[in-house]
Amino acid sequence: MAKRTPSIDTKNLTAVQLMELDACVRCGECVKWCPTYAASGGKPGLAPRDKILRWRQYMNKSYGLKAKLFGPQEVSPSELEEFKDDVHGCTTCGVCATVCEAGINTVEIWEAIRTNLVKKGIGPYGKQSAFPKLVGQYHNPYMKDQKDRLAWVPPDVKIEDKADIVYFTGCTAGYNQLALAFATSRVLNKLGIKFAMLGEEEWCCGSALIRTGQVHVDDVARELARHNVEALQKKGAKKVLFACAGCFRAAKIDWPRLLGKELPFEVIHITQFLADLIQADKIKWEKPINKTITYHDPCHLGRHVGVFNAPRYVLSHIPGVKFVEMDRSKEFQRCCGAGGGVKAGMPDLAVAMGESRVKDALETNADILSSACPFCKRNLSDGRDALKSDIVVEDIIELVAEALGLSTS
């Protein structure tokens, strides 16, 4: 009698990741910190520890001693479907990795498992499955015309055809959250920074595909990275600026992995760029912002890349600003809820997480909740609205523009 085929396989999981899965000691520290678990009201399947233990159980059924002696035990399709839902209910924020006593790199594991399941036809979740087709066809996830990439640019903004510095706008700022694009471009002009943009040659960074386990689908993610790098080189880029934390993370970490080589230019977040200018005394403020401001660390900018100080340095140097920290900040911040495809796949869960983060901000009595990512701004605003709060949600670059006397509309 032929042995049953294993229900799962180990593809996309490295030897190190397999050892990390085995290293979990079930202490539960990650459960205390997980924002999706908390926002769900304590749904056991969303707890990081539970996901690791379940996958380990599936591995034992497929490849353990009993499986080798008597053949693999089946993991039912319904069980794998439920697991798929739970593993996609994670924003990949990385706080579980931060607090893990065993040092498990959970973000890499979640993305590897998602990819593994998608390759087997299990997942992704809901609307997430449309990402490869949309981005592959339109080169952005919003089905917008690429010719409109620079349609937002106002007459007062000067853009070079080629320059050492290129501003990578991102799909969300370029199409949906224009205030961030207005603010970034006008701030650069005000500071005398000559910069270029890619226009219709700017394609999606690919973050949504990678985060949702679809990095391999039709090789779209790799093609996006290749095209963007080549387009940036043609513009003469030596330094590429990002005001979107998701795009920044994709360029900084994912593009080199996809292409198998280092990038031929420096990638830097706008807060790092501004912090350097402030330190060099090259910014002359024109208008004080007499408000109390707190700051939310985008997961992709903070825990994923390690940029914590630059945003705070910028905020603390804006005249009139009283800066206050939330209890959970920097490495231990609470995710806004927008990442990992959750905003698209599970919007109600995303907003519930946004509400939790806004409550953290309200405890500081801040007038303004700031961040440095359009996705964070969107979901924090949704959380604020759900709470019927009057706290203002603004991106750091908008605040910088205001303090320089510039319009963001």
Curated annotation (Swiss-Prot):
Domain annotation 4Fe-4S ferredoxin-type: ranges: 14-44, 81-110
Cofactor binding: number and manner: Binds 2 [4Fe-4S] clusters per subunit.
Binding sites annotated in the UniProt record for [4Fe-4S] cluster 1: C24, C27, C30, C100
UniProt: [4Fe-4S] cluster 2 binding residues: C34, C90, C93, C96
Keywords carried by this UniProt record: 4Fe-4S, Iron, Iron-sulfur, Metal-binding, Methanogenesis, Oxidoreductase, Repeat
Cofactor: [4Fe-4S] cluster
Iron-sulfur among keywords: yes
Chloroplast recorded as keyword: no
GO molecular function: 4 iron, 4 sulfur cluster binding; CoB--CoM heterodisulfide reductase activity; metal ion binding
Chemical reaction(s) catalysed: methanophenazine + coenzyme B + coenzyme M = dihydromethanophenazine + coenzyme M-coenzyme B heterodisulfide
Pathway(s) it belongs to: Cofactor metabolism; coenzyme M-coenzyme B heterodisulfide reduction; coenzyme B and coenzyme M from coenzyme M-coenzyme B heterodisulfide: step 1/1
Its job: Part of a complex that catalyzes the reversible reduction of CoM-S-S-CoB to the thiol-coenzymes H-S-CoM (coenzyme M) and H-S-CoB (coenzyme B).
Subunit details: The dihydromethanophenazine:CoB--CoM heterodisulfide reductase is composed of two subunits; HdrD and HdrE.
Family affiliation: Belongs to the HdrD family.
Record protein name field: Dihydromethanophenazine:CoB--CoM heterodisulfide reductase subunit D
Source organism of this protein record: Methanosarcina barkeri (strain Fusaro / DSM 804)
